[in-house]
UniProtKB/Swiss-Prot annotation:
It comes from Methanopyrus kandleri (strain AV19 / DSM 6324 / JCM 9639 / NBRC 100938). InterPro entries: Ribosomal_eL34, Ribosomal_eL34_C_sf, Ribosomal_eL34_CS, Ribosomal_L34e_arc-type. This is Large ribosomal subunit protein eL34. PROSITE patterns: RIBOSOMAL_L34E (PS01145). Pfam families: Ribosomal_L34e. GO terms for cellular component: ribonucleoprotein complex; ribosome. The lineage of its organism: Archaea, Methanobacteriati, Methanobacteriota, Methanomada group, Methanopyri. Belongs to the eukaryotic ribosomal protein eL34 family.
Amino acid sequence: MPAPRYRSRSCRRVYKRTPGGRTVIHFEKKIPNWPKCGACGRRLNGVMRGRNVELKNAPKTQKRPNRPYGGVLCPECARKLIKDKVRYKFWERKREQPWLPVLPDEEPPEPEE
């Protein structure tokens, strides 16, 4: 009978063959899933996967990419967010200063409710 701490399924069961020919069970902590993008749910590149203890001891460059929203959003979603923020700020300024030029392919944002 395994010890009570091993009876839960929070540990992975790994079957090992010993040199004597017996098969024994080793209990290992499960590896967490890869970090996902907060917007689209895709797997984040350049972000380490591991338990909190492993992440705590890892160097900063392995934990997340060195860019805005690195480790939270994938590059495509971060690019979209930054562009949307810039566009929103432009139209906010345009409302305050109507003399700013508007290019023909630009459309004003939808009014917020």
